[in-house]
């Protein structure tokens, strides 16, 4: 019980620290260019496409995950995955790719 407060406080601080990255307007058009150059070898980046790598979900499927948010994508892009290389994107590129993925959400 006494460890819950530090853990909760730490998660809160990480969330707050991520917010400035989203405070500036992201550019989905720039994001599709970054995605084409960085992600398309494995992921389908446009709606209706099939991913070249069957383990890499298409971006429109990622966008359609219930509750998908910029912070969730930010965490995902900064966390290593077993079958995905560790990407090194600038803050601006990451923000733009996230904006592009979220632009694929059906409303």
Predicted regions and their residues:
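Soluble non-cytosolic domains of exported or imported proteins
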Residues: 29, 67, 88-92
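Periplasmic/extracellular electron-transfer cofactor-ligation site
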Residues: 25-56, 79-83, 103-107
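Structural motif corresponding to alpha-helix initiation and N-cap regions
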Residues: 42, 67-70
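Axial heme c-ligation environment in periplasmic c-type cytochrome domains
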Residues: 54-62, 74-104
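Bacterial N-terminal signal peptides that target proteins for export
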Residues: 1-9
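Bacterial N-terminal signal peptides
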Residues: 8-18
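Sec/Tat signal peptide C-region and signal peptidase I cleavage site
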Residues: 19-23
């Amino acid at each position: 019980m006494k460890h819950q407060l530090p853990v909760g406080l730490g998660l809160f601080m990480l969330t707050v620290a991520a917010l400035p990255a989203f405070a500036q307007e992201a550019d989905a058009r720039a994001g599709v260019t970054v995605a084409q150059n960085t992600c398309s070898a494995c992921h389908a980046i446009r709606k209706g496409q099939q991913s070249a790598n069957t383990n890499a979900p298409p971006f429109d499927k990622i966008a359609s995950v219930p509750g998908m948010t910029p912070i969730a994508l930010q965490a995902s892009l900064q966390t290593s995955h077993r079958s995905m290389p560790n990407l090194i994107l600038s803050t601006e590129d990451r923000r733009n790719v996230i904006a592009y993925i979220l632009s694929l959400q059906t409303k």
